[in-house]
Amino acid sequence: MEAPAEIKVKTRKFSLTKGTIKISFELEGSRGRIRSLKLKQRNAVLDTSFPFEMQTAKKGNTIVYHAQINVDQYPMETAFWDVVASVDKEGKGNYEDAILGGLSSKLKLKLILFPRWTRTGDGHMVYPFVNGARQFTIQYRKYDPKYDSYAFIAKEFLALFCYFILKPYWDHKKLWLICEKYCTMAQDNGLYFFRYCMEHAPEKDRSRIFYVIDKKCPDYQAVKEYDANVIQFMSFKYMIYLSAARYLISTDAIRHFYIWDSPNSIYKVLYQARKNIVFLQHGVMGFKQCHRTFHKGGGNQMALFVVSSGYEQKIIHDYFGYDNEEIIITGLARWDVLEDKSDPAH
């Protein structure tokens, strides 16, 4: 299913209260007229959407739109939801869907500095998803009392304060943080790279290398013997270390170093802006199209891309846009523990 185009508007208001989303915006009459607005699930197969109630008012050559929707009234599913307008851009009565864009920089900053969400009656939460685009995108998912609270936001601000007030001290540690998917796993290249460091790196280097994992997860057992160099995911210490780390080393994208699908926050924005990622990957670049996710210049840009062959290096250079100096042919860390059990007789 092809994604709809975008119509940029001038934002006036965007709020979430008790399950209700309210949007107020302006659009010059010469740029088109919006007939209706809907909340549309971002899904390549399903076509699910729910209508906004909308009122309009004219202000000179501009039309002011006021729209609202109460998500408690609809069977929402865990997903990203775009605000989509039915718009006639040429004034000929030909209406087409277009994602509402134009989230103002001021409002975007406000949503980051002062995060907000609304809880629904069925244990879910709704909040605006703020990324590089300026589109009106909503995320709907289960409410997690551990992280979806103002107490946790206070923890983020305190961690940032403790980092910046002693920034030279923390930066001097030259920390390396290693993780795998969601910081819940230790079974791939991240684990074996960490083990190699623990067993072969000089003591002065080992003291600054840490594996990040939720210690309640089963895979913690794989790194437990190096517990002094294992740090609890989302602990206060970890949040300071994440701010200070010289290198983030992972088999996955930078988002895996933090709570998955967390609401907007200044902490999240600052850490995701980092470009010092060493990408160990999984070893599937030769047949899996990941260039849109990991391309150079994107939100998941890597400082160093680890590959296993010249063939793979060419793929990363040609399709991902990295220079050869940013791609190292080392093989994959987990290959170091492979044992040749073949029988020469066969």
Task: Mark where each language-model region is.
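Active-site and donor-binding regions of nucleotide-sugar-utilizing enzymes
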Residues: 26, 47, 58-64, 175-339
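A short helix/loop element that forms part of the nucleotide-sugar donor recognition site in Leloir-type
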Residues: 340-346
